[in-house]
């Protein structure tokens, strides 16, 4: 996996360039991905 240092970008700077609408979409996507990861940790019965 490639680290953010190798990609040579600043996430905070990129987020600052997003419009408010894009920022809301990004946050929603992050929440969805995070929730999916949490659900994967729950053992299946």
Curated annotation (Swiss-Prot):
Any one Gene Ontology cellular component term annotated for this protein: nucleus
Gene3D superfamilies: Death Domain, Fas
Principal location listed in the UniProt entry: cytoplasm
One GO term of the biological process aspect: negative regulation of peptidyl-serine phosphorylation
Annotated tissue distribution: Expressed in all tissues tested, including spleen, lymph node, thymus, tonsil, peripheral blood leukocyte, bone marrow, liver, heart, brain, placenta, lung, skeletal muscle, kidney and pancreas.
Highest taxon listed in the record's lineage: Eukaryota
UniProt subcellular location: Cytoplasm; Nucleus
Keyword Cytoplasm: yes
Induction remarks: Up-regulated by inflammatory stimulus (LPS).
Keywords: Cytoplasm, Immunity, Innate immunity, Nucleus, Signal transduction inhibitor
Record function comment: May function as a negative regulator of NF-kappa-B by preventing RELA/p65 phosphorylation at 'Ser-536', thereby inhibiting its transcriptional activity. Through NF-kappa-B regulation may control cytokine release upon Toll-like receptors activation and therefore play a role in modulation of innate immunity. May also play a role in cell cycle progression and apoptotic process.
Protein known as: NLR family pyrin domain-containing protein 2B
Originating species: Homo sapiens (Human)
């Amino acid at each position: 996996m490639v680290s953010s240092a190798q990609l040579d970008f600043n996430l905070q700077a990129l987020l600052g360039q997003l419009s408010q609408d894009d920022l809301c979409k990004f946050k929603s996507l992050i929440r969805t991905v995070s929730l999916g990861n949490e659900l994967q940790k729950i053992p299946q019965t």
